[in-house]
Each structure stands twice: as structure tokens, then as C-alpha cells.
Amino acid sequence: MLTMLTDRIDSQLVLSRLPRSRFQRFWETPTLIMKEESASSSGSIILAEKSVNMRYCVRFASDSDFQTTFTLPQSTEEKYDKEQHPGEDEASSPLPSPLKVPYKWMPSSFIVKQCHTQLAFYNKHIIWLSRERKVPTSLGVSLYIPEGFFGITFYKCLDAQFVCMPELLESRLQVPQLDVVNLNDTFQSIFPGTIEGDIGVFPCFVPEPWQLMNLPPPNEHRFFSLRTRQTLVIGPGHTQTVYFDAAYVHAPGICALIVGVRQFSQSDLIIRPTIWLPGTAAGVTVVNTSHTTVCISPHTTVAKAVFTTHRFTYLPVGSHPLGQMIVPPTPDIGFTHTPEHALLQRTPSPVDDDVDETEEDEKSSDAESPVNTNDVIFDVGPKPPRHP
């Protein structure tokens, strides 16, 4: 090996040999660690001391996105013990392999069909809309979203008289519902086949704590809540952008979504779905489609944020109050129609959900007294605690 000159701290030039690198040369063929069986009768395994060169490491790191690798965690109710179920195959396990989301149909005004790895739906009956806050309508399907995943309802319809708000579905037994905001001052009917959309399931991703700034810890479903810090007053027909003191650093292959909560979808407020870019403050745009002033109390959960390893895109809709539509990619997780699945037997009925929503809405309307102004104030503040 040739010698080289090195500059020491004492500023004296001395001759020294090039230290031997623990990595291979760039031009050498990359080799992996291999296992070789010993010739001895003990059958011990000896690891061949072979390293991997830097070029191979860089190429492997660029081709493989380590943060998109997700292993489904099994909860206590999802674990399948073969010792307790002898003689049964994997087909009877709580979650099929490869992973597919179990679902079943329910009587409703919608027709649901399985289309590749998504559930496509459209209305088969006329849907009547009024100016009053209507009870959400079931989409006619119940599904079980496993832990570590989330679902999203994406609507393909865009009309000047109404708007269908997307919804994030947490990891549990779910009965997706339709939330429609009437943009007209009169009663109207939505003809069959007008409302159509898809339901997709995607993996959740929880960034490291050092990647998040001023974000509270997520809930058990890996959703982050975004709350207002002060009172917001939005005039009739006005649009206001609400910023939250929260941000996150760039993470390769990660996408963040912000979607409004259902409490606002049932009112005359439209919270535009947003793709949260890294290095920017979280924010949502709120549109007041009513003829009254709306007051949002402090510490009110306006939207929920979720991180995923799939890329979502925007579809601008021009002058429509929705502003933009989120277009999800093709999910990797499919569905399987298993009406007799054990996890679907405990699904709450849509009627029970509607009753609970109505009770919560009645209590939230009495949370605070109206403000004395010339306009009518509709308070959508936090819900009061339930007293026995």
C-alpha cells in the first residue's frame, strides 16, 4: 500500500500508512452476511465475516423506504391462539391472511359493491334535504378496521346545491355515514345515482416525538386532535382560515391529512380537507354557508390529523365552497364480504349511533349562552360532560 502525507496537530509532516477501511472498496462486488454449516457433527452455524460496501448500502437505502414498512400489531381481541382452537385453519382466524377488512351489507338507501381494493357506493333512493340539521344517513355497510389502520370516505360527486363531506374512520367497528351540507335555501331532492364515492383503508404512521412540534399525543387510534386557541366568529357566507400552533418536520414517504370532525359536518360549516405539508403550520379553511354568524368556542376540536405512508393528492374544484377534494391513492388492503364474521356481530346499529349523535348535539347547544349581537349565534363549542 502506498504511503501518504498527513498533517498532525503539531504541524509536522510525517509519513504514515493509509488506515485500512472496515468497508469494502466501491468497485468490489457487494457481499452479504452468509450462513455456512460447519462440518462438525454438532451442526453449529458459523457466520461468514463479510461486510457490505457503502455503495450497496446507499442504493439499498434509496430503494427501500424503511418508514413505509408496517407490521400489523395484534390486539388482545384479535390474537388467534391455535392451541385453543385445534384443528382449525387460518381461514377461521379473526383477521384473514393476507389482510383484508371484513364487512357486511346493511339495509339502507345505498348500494355498496366491492371494486378491487375499495368499496364503491351510490344512492339507490331519493335523498331529501332540508335547511335543518339532518341526522346522518348510513351508507349501508359495516366494517371492522384493524388496529394500526384508518379508513376514509371519498365522494366523487360535486354539485352546486349540496356537498358531501369526507370522513376519517378510526380503527374499530365502524358504520360509515353520509353527511350532506345543503347549499340551497329550499328543500331539495337528490336523485338516485347522484351521490357516489369510495371507502378505502390505509395504514397509519406515528412520527417520532422529535418530528412533531406543539402537537398533543395521539389517541388510541393514532389520530391527532386540532383545537382552537381562541374564540372564532365567522360571518354569514364568509370564509376564514384557522391556523394551529403545530408543525412537523419532513419525513420521507409520509403524508398528513386534516379532515373536519363530524360535529361540523352536521351543521352549515364546511371544513375543507387539507393535505398538511411538512415544515408548515397546520391550518384549515372554514366556510360558513348559513345566513347567521357562527361562533366557535375556544378549545374546540375542529379537525383531526392522521399520518400515513400513502400519497394523497388534491383536485381543485374552482369556485365551489368545498374548494378542493382529496383524491386517495389505490389502497393495498382489500375487503372481504363475511357477514357472519365474529368481529362484525358487535357492530352498533346506525339507529343507536343517530340517537347518540342527537343527544350530544342537544347538550352541546346548551354549552354556553348566546352572545348579544345583531346576528344569531350558533355555538358549536365543546360538549359538556355527561351527568348521571
UniProtKB/Swiss-Prot annotation:
Its cofactor is Mg(2+). It catalyses: dUTP + H2O = dUMP + diphosphate + H(+). Residues 77-88 have a biased composition (Basic and acidic residues). It comes from the Viruses. GO terms for cellular component: virion component. It is an enzyme of class 3 (hydrolase). InterPro entries: dUTPase-like_sf, Herpes_Orf11, HSV_DUT. It is found in: Virion. Residues 351-363 have a biased composition (Acidic residues). Its EC number is 3.6.1.23. The keyword Coiled coil does not apply. Belongs to the dUTPase family. Involved in nucleotide metabolism: produces dUMP, the immediate precursor of thymidine nucleotides and decreases the intracellular concentration of dUTP to avoid uracil incorporation into viral DNA. This is Deoxyuridine 5'-triphosphate nucleotidohydrolase. It comes from Human cytomegalovirus (strain AD169).
